[in-house]
């Protein structure tokens, strides 16, 4: 693709798309593959002109020993060969219990300076990757019923991760997959949980946005209000505002919004179909 784009003035002659600048390696989990295979894929992407690689993995939570000296050596070799290619490690902690230590009383253990103590293996893994200044580490997590739908837990997690050099990237509303109504949390409740969890956090600790994935692209749940809008039908209980964050196929749509009347039981877009007030984003076309 990138070769064709370069040979045709910066756009693909059939699709009109520009070069592929950034690639997400996801799955499955790429780190279920051996280092050799991961390195080969990354090198191939770099050779194809990709400027930035993101790699999504749950291994930091499930198997932190995966980030051993052999893995780090592979990453160092890649960076030495392709120093201009950016790399982001997208990890997936859903709850602070996945990486913090607790005492017999169930409370998180503290270091002498008041910071929270990490599981040793996870601490070593995080320090191994963050010590390499060219690896950016970011966390993203879905909000899951009965698992992390708790503002206090989310606050602890965001603060502890940022202190360890991990950026808080996204929290997600659940998707409309098989049995999703059994573990998804209502959208408006998730927004309130995240908003409550970020009270008391610093600006940099509270960077995470709440995202829900529409077919048009990542969409932010930008606001939920409690008061009616005078003279506007359907706003008697307040409104929810969706905002398009990213639409790779139609970048001009970024920032466009959709306003719907509130539905406290809604867990997916179709639960708002009967209460759309304004939709410049085209979420309900």
Feature-to-residue mapping (PLM):
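Conserved AdoMet/S-adenosylmethionine-binding subsite of the radical SAM
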Residues: 2-5, 9, 13-22, 28-189, ...
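Auxiliary Fe-S-binding modules of radical SAM enzymes
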Residues: 155-285
């Amino acid at each position: 693709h990138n070769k064709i784009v370069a040979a045709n003035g910066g756009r693909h002659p059939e699709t009109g798309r520009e070069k592929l600048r950034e690639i997400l390696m996801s799955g499955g989990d790429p780190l279920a593959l051996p280092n050799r295979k991961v390195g080969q894929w990354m090198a191939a992407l770099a050779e194809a002109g990709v400027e930035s690689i993101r790699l999504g993995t749950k291994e930091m939570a499930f198997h932190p020993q995966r980030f051993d000296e052999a893995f780090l050596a592979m990453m160092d070799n890649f960076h030495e060969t392709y120093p201009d290619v950016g790399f982001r490690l997208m990890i997936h902690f859903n709850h602070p219990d996945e990486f913090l230590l607790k005492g017999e009383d169930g409370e998180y253990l503290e270091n002498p300076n008041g910071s929270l103590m990490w599981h040793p293996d996870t601490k070593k893994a995080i320090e191994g990757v963050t010590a390499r200044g060219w690896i950016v580490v970011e966390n993203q997590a879905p909000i899951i019923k009965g698992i992390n739908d708790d503002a206090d837990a989310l606050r602890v997690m965001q603060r502890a991760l940022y202190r360890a050099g991990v950026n808080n990237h996204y929290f997600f509303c659940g998707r409309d997959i098989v049995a999703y109504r059994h573990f998804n949390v209502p959208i408006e409740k998730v927004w309130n949980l995240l908003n409550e969890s970020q009270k008391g956090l610093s600006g940099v600790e509270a960077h995470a946005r709440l995202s829900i994935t529409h077919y048009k692209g990542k969409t932010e749940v930008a606001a939920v209000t409690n008061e009616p809008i005078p003279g506007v039908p359907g706003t008697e209980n307040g409104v929810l505002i969706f905002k398009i964050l990213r639409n790779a196929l139609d970048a001009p749509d970024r920032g466009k919004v959709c306003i719907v009347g509130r539905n406290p039981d809604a867990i997916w877009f179709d639960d708002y179909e009967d209460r759309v007030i304004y939709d410049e984003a085209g979420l309900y076309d």
